[in-house]
Amino acid sequence: MIIYLHGFDSNSPGNHEKVLQLQFIDPDVRLVSYSTRHPKHDMQHLLKEVDKMLQLNVDERPLICGVGLGGYWAERIGFLCDIRQVVFNPNLFPYENMEGKIDRPEEYADIATKCVTNFREKNRDRCLVILSRHDEALDSQRSAQALHPYYEIVWDEEQTHKFKNISPHLQRIKAFKTLG
């Protein structure tokens, strides 16, 4: 089972395309939708939905995957639910760059301080990070600096922030999922 979390643009047709691409790894891909506008409520909702899916799950090696803001959530929810994560161009600093787009961007900073201390150290090697060199929305070098000490970084030379085509990375994701 692969759980897919969309980014800030929840209505993007690219979400459906990514789900279809992920089905080459596992036919059971589940899109979990969330508001993107209310961080604390989103966190509660995502934890509840992912936990529900895991309770009914038969896959011994489930995976959670997210793009952009979905990558922010996939890393945290995956850690809290003890499943491996794959994140594409994760928005690591939404409290800095979501101002004017969501109601309370400062809630992201609050969530970060309330999360498990040094959670990335405790999550070491359980997240695969795929970054675009041509991310027009986020500073991928800053993301790499923050994540490289803990996770493997794979660089993509073609895609932009929304990462429309993930197919060149499917074999690597499948291998990572298999490690479970």
Swiss-Prot record:
Residue stretches spanning the membrane: none
Cross-referenced Pfam families: UPF0227
PANTHER family linked: ESTERASE YQIA-RELATED, UPF0227 PROTEIN YCFP
Family: Belongs to the UPF0227 family.
NCBIfam families: PRK04940.1
Protein name: UPF0227 protein YcfP
Organism: Salmonella paratyphi B (strain ATCC BAA-1250 / SPB7)
